[in-house]
C-alpha cells in the first residue's frame, strides 16, 4: 500500500467469524430471558431469606409474644408441601424395596405414625425432611402432617377451619426456630366480585346473563405456628387448629409390628435426590440451636407444670415427649421412656388418664398411648422448643 492508496480496513462478515458474535448475542438474550421469565410471569420466589417483610405476608397483626420471628434463609415454598401422596400397604414394603436401587424405608427409619378411626398411616421422616408439610386425608379426615426438622417436632392437625379444609405450605419463616406454615387460601375460598372501585369484596352468589364475570380476589394467607397450632398473623389470626391425638414418632419396624394394617406414603418421583442430600443428623448431634430463641422457660414458668412432671435442667436439644391428658402435661425424655418401657410397659397417670409407654432400644423407639383408649396429645420434640412455646407469654 502506497501513501496515496485508499485506507482499506478489514471488515468482519458473517462468514469470516461474525456468526460467533451473533451466536453469543443470541445466547446472552436467551439467558436474560430465562433469568427474568419468572419475574415477568409472577413466578419469582417470595422471600429473600433475610427479611421477613419480603415474604409477601400481612404482618400487621403478627403475634409472637416475645418469640424470635425470623427468615430461615430459604424463600417461601423452598420446601414444597406434599399434597395427597400415594400410599402403599405396609406389608408390601419389602417387595417395593426389592425393586429399588436404594431402599425407601427400612426397619430403623423413623416415621410419624397416625391413627384415625382404626385406619393408620406412616409418614417417613426422610420424606418429611424435604417437604415438612403433607396435606392428606385419612379415614375421611383432612389432615396436615407437619414436621419441623430444626426442632424434631411432629404434630398432626385437622386442617379444617370453619368447616372448610385448607391446604398448608411452608412459609420459609421461623418462630423460635420452629416451622411456620401458611394457608393457601386462594385455592379454597369462594370467588368474590367488586361492585365498584371503592366497594369491598362481596361473595358472588349468582350472575345474570348481562352481568360481567366475577373478578377473582385472592385473599391474603395467614401464618400458622406449628408448635402453637395457631394462626399468628393474617386474616384468621388467633384461630387454632385441632391437634390429632395419639400421634407418635417411632421406627418403621415398631410401627408396622403394632399396626400391621398400616399404610405408608410414597415420595414424589423427584424426591429421591433431595432425600439423599438433605439430612439433619449432624445438626441434631451438636448442641447449638442455629436460629434465635426469644423465649426460654424454667420449670416454674412452664404452662401446666405439675410436681415430678417436668424434667430439670437439660440440654436444649434433648429429645423429649410431652404427654397431655386431663388438662395436665408430663414431659419425659426419649431416653428415659426407651429405658423404662423396654422390658415391660411403663405405666403412669397424667391428668387422671392411665398412660402406657412401650419401647424398643437400638435405636430408641417409643409408642405412647392410654391404656383405657382415652385420646391424648403426644408431642415429640426437642426440649428447647417445648420450653419456648410453653411459657405464660407464648401463643397458645
Where does each model-flagged region fall?
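N-terminal targeting leaders characterized by basic, low-complexity, disordered sequences
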Residues: 1-4
